[in-house]
């Protein structure tokens, strides 16, 4: 039934398999035991934060150096930034003797040591970061440098548009179980910007950092927070000849009706200039920021509409008085309108400037 000599060959194969697998099983048991009882090799996600020195919190000094800032979107209230992020802190576990080591500075990979978990609060999605350098001094001071790019969300205030100034914020926090463990500080020597940093249509005034004294709760954990502020002001000169002056010229043309005696001509003039103003306003509206509050430009546009409304009433009253055989009274109202409209318009603009700019 079976080939001759089959049973002895099967027995020999089983014996050979036992001789092969028994040593391998023993090695596996030893390796599992070493992994179970040996201390872990700490990496960035495994090393616990260094303990406070002399019952003081661990201070992480931060700095952001702007390389470029671009694509400021008024409607989305976002901007893009390309910059360096520098961190420094002391970890005594990394201290070494430069004489014995033969080096004055040691370099590490990000996975080899503990690194504070710095997060950008108002960044859309996650920042794109490339670690440039991680170096450690003999006393354990760690210098961390990365280059990053991000799209940042920052609320804008358009109340004074187009004469507005804005503060663009970049918020940093550090994750910590207890605020006594890790706090953020500003390294002023590492805060700055390139001289050629610019934003189209804006003047960059300053770039500073502010430490927020009050921590806030996030996911039942307290955070330490920094606020990097980029102060900018809008280049408003182009808005004057392109938006403001055309609206004023159209309005002033309608006032020539106060020097005409023809009712039909006056009505045609006022209504046609009103239509021109509406058409121009629709064209300008596409470039104006959409806000739930009144802006300075919006207030001027609304005020101009009011003057058109009053001008139509004046022309109608003037014609009514003439029909009712009161030409003298109609003429006096017309003469008064020639002075009253410009004066009231000037006073209204002064009031608006005071309300929006606090002069």
UniProtKB/Swiss-Prot annotation:
Periplasmic side: 44-235, 287-294
SUPFAM superfamilies for this protein: Neurotransmitter-gated ion-channel transmembrane pore, Nicotinic receptor ligand binding domain-like
Gene Ontology CC entries for this record: plasma membrane
Topology within the bilayer: Multi-pass membrane protein
Record annotation: effect of changing residue 264 to Q/D: Decreases binding affinity of TBA
Signal sequence coordinates: 1-43
Additional note from the record: The homologous nature of GLIC to eukaryotic nicotinic acetylcholine receptors and other eukaryotic pentameric ligand-gated ion channels, and its sensitivity to general anesthetics, define GLIC as a structural and functional model of signal transduction in the nervous system, also relevant for exploring the molecular basis of anesthetic action.
Role this protein plays: Cationic channel with similar permeabilities for Na(+) and K(+), that is activated by an increase of the proton concentration on the extracellular side. Displays no permeability for chloride ions. Shows slow kinetics of activation, no desensitization and a single channel conductance of 8 pS. Might contribute to adaptation to external pH change.
Subunit structure: Homopentamer.
Protein name: Proton-gated ion channel
Organism, scientific name: Gloeobacter violaceus (strain ATCC 29082 / PCC 7421)
């Amino acid at each position: 039934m079976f080939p001759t000599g089959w049973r002895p060959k099967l027995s020999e194969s089983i014996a050979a398999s036992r001789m092969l697998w028994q040593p391998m099983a023993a090695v596996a048991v030893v390796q599992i035991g070493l992994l179970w009882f040996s201390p872990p090799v700490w990496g960035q996600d495994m090393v616990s934060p260094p303990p406070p020195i002399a019952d003081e919190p661990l201070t992480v000094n931060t700095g952001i150096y702007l390389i470029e800032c671009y694509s400021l979107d008024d409607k989305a209230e976002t901007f893009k930034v390309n910059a360096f992020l520098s961190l420094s802190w002391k970890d005594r576990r990394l201290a070494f003797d430069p004489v014995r080591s033969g080096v004055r500075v040691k370099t590490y990979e990000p996975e080899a040591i503990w690194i504070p978990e710095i997060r950008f609060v108002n960044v859309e999605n996650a920042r794109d970061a490339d670690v440039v350098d991680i170096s450690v001094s003999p006393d354990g001071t760690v210098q961390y440098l990365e280059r990053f790019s991000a799209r940042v969300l920052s609320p804008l205030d358009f109340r004074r548009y187009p004469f507005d100034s804005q503060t663009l914020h970049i918020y940093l926090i550090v994750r910590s179980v207890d605020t006594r463990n890790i706090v953020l500080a500003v390294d002023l020597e590492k805060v700055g910007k390139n001289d050629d940093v610019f934003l189209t249509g804006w003047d960059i005034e300053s770039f500073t950092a502010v430490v927020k004294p009050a921590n806030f709760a996030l996911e039942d954990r307290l955070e330490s927070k920094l606020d990097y502020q980029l102060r900018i002001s809008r280049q408003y000169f182009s808005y004057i000849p392109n938006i403001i002056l055309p609206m004023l010229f159209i309005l002033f043309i309608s006032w020539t009706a106060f020097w005409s005696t023809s009712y039909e001509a006056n009505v045609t003039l006022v209504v046609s200039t009103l239509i021109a103003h509406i058409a121009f306003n629709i064209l300008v509206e596409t470039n104006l920021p959409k806000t739930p509050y009144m802006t300075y430009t919006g207030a001027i546009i609304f005020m101009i509409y009011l003057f058109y409304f009053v001008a139509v009433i004046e022309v109608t009253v003037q014609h009514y008085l003439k029909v009712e055989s009161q030409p003298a009274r109609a003429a006096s109202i017309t003469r008064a309108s020639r002075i009253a409209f410009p004066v009231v318009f000037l006073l209204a603009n002064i009031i608006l400037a005071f309300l929006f700019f606090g002069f």
